[in-house]
Amino acid sequence: MAELDIGQHCQVEHCRQRDFLPFVCDDCSGIFCLEHRSRESHGCPEVTVINERLKTDQHTSYPCSFKDCAERELVAVICPYCEKNFCLRHRHQSDHECEKLEIPKPRMAATQKLVKDIIDSKTGETASKRWKGAKNSETAAKVALMKLKMHADGDKSLPQTERIYFQVFLPKGSKEKSKPMFFCHRWSIGKAIDFAASLARLKNDNNKFTAKKLRLCHITSGEALPLDHTLETWIAKEDCPLYNGGNIILEYLNDEEQFCKNVESYLE
């Protein structure tokens, strides 16, 4: 009686075992026994191709230079100051502890003096109203905070203890006059701007040198807050602070503009 021609021989040279239920490799289409069915066990030539492809793909992404950060981006995000590459989370100077970060104490001192001069230049009833408004802003913020907590948009994953709430007045000409939002108190001003722009679906060209930049401005003085400062820094200030539950302005300014004009018009 003739032997039935069933099964096939394993294609591994030193094996050649006949298997009645042979395995076909999905990559090289070779036929193998149970022992040699994996790509590694039969030395599949496609393994080398895949490994080379993975190595090539690694070169098309950009690693973050910040210590202990393993994030990679598909496009280069280069800090214009230290000229190193970072992920989106660490792209601002304060977030990656930039070696070129300068503490703008002289400029801030000059700015505070300018704010004081502007206020002092106001006389009579106008100046009186300004000071009265500043005095009552903390109380007003506490009253508004409860309402903001019910309606504000933000990152829902943030712990309640880290949230800070603002009624954000949007740039002139926007579809909405203002929008309630919450942020992490440890975020830099620059990061808060990016987040607010995303929530309000605003054009954000802050990474372009020639375009007008989105800036967060103080509701009382109109001062554009420095991008590298943190929100908690301004909450803790003794002179002209921000208040949790208070108002803040988001507006487009030129690079040379350090103040938002006509802040009263945003509240009308």
Curated annotation (Swiss-Prot):
Role, per record: Plays a role in the regulation of cytoplasmic stress granules (SGs) turnover. SGs are dynamic and transient cytoplasmic ribonucleoprotein assemblies important for cellular protein homeostasis when protein production is suspended after acute exogenous stress. Associates with SGs and is involved in the efficient and specific arsenite-induced clearance process of SGs through the recruitment of the ubiquitin-selective ATPase VCP and the 26S proteasome.
Binding-site residues for Zn(2+) 1, renumbered to this chain: C10, C15, C33, H36
Subunit structure, interactors included: Associates with the 26S proteasome; this association occurs upon exposure to arsenite and is reduced in the presence of ATP. Interacts (via AN1-type 1 and 2 zinc fingers) with PSMD1; this interaction is increased upon arsenite treatment and occurs in an ATP-independent manner. Interacts with PSMC4. Interacts with PSMA1. Interacts (via its ubiquitin-like region) with VCP; this interaction occurs in an arsenite-dependent manner and is necessary for the recruitment of the ubiquitin-selective ATPase VCP to stress granules (SGs).
Subcellular location per the Swiss-Prot or TrEMBL entry: Cytoplasm, Stress granule
GO CC annotation, single: cytoplasm
Biological source species: Homo sapiens (Human)
UniProt keyword terms in alphabetical order: Acetylation, Cytoplasm, Metal-binding, Repeat, Zinc, Zinc-finger
Stretch list, region ubiquitin-like: 160-260
Domain of life: Eukaryota
Protein name: AN1-type zinc finger protein 1
Upper lineage: Eukaryota, Metazoa, Chordata, Craniata, Vertebrata
Binding site for Zn(2+) 4: C79, C82, H96, C98
